[in-house]
């Protein structure tokens, strides 16, 4: 299957794709950013681009989700876009085509293995404008970044906007990303106005964690277990009424897990 055919199928399924997005998606070959089979991608499923040394899987999102993120980013030519993670460079390459030679794409990649993969794939990619790949610690050291960004896309689940990133969003700009815990998140557009943040809820989503370390942690790790219980409890609590006594017991369990030392043996 070609990208043109895939985009046509997404449009037929009701996924909003404007001409700028369509052109960029068709132009960028996902196979350049992964060595794994693309069969799942052609069937609108996520595909891996990297397995880390600790066994965590990093994926390129399903095409419909890629198109959805691009739609909600409201990208125009010449914009400066920041990505927290870039799906192995694939998403950055698409956005680079969209912003063109007058725009910039800045990737902040927290995980070293993922960053090296991203740098390697983008090095042999013909960019339209400028793409830079940074470590989190680099952000405060590059003077140009202080001018700020109109758009920031977070490509993995987080609970809050990192302070160092929120400070770089210009007034009237916004952060788009999946906010929540490991079980479920809400795709939020968080717009910055006069120092305050205003949320637009764009629906429920399921993304892997932005922090790859969470994927590399055993599910029996006390903090990981507490996060999963809390997230699942919030999800269920939004659908059915739970007795206050039960709520209190669950909250106490979560608190107790978070107070446990991280090196407790559980094998």
Model-derived segments and spans:
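General "foldedness" signal
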Residues: 35, 39, 56, 83, ...
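Intrinsic-disorder/low-complexity coil detector
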Residues: 15, 45-47, 135, 260, ...
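Class I SAM-dependent transferase core
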Residues: 1-98, 113-125, 206-210
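Short, structured coil/loop segments at alpha-helix boundaries
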Residues: 1-4, 15-19, 34-35, 109-111, ...
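SAM/dcSAM-binding transferase cores
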Residues: 1-3, 149, 179-267
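Conserved nucleotide-cofactor-binding alpha/beta core module
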Residues: 70, 74-184, 191-193
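Short alpha-helical interface elements
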Residues: 31, 35, 49-53, 94-100, ...
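Short, intrinsically disordered/low-complexity patches at protein termini
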Residues: 46, 105-107, 129-131, 200, ...
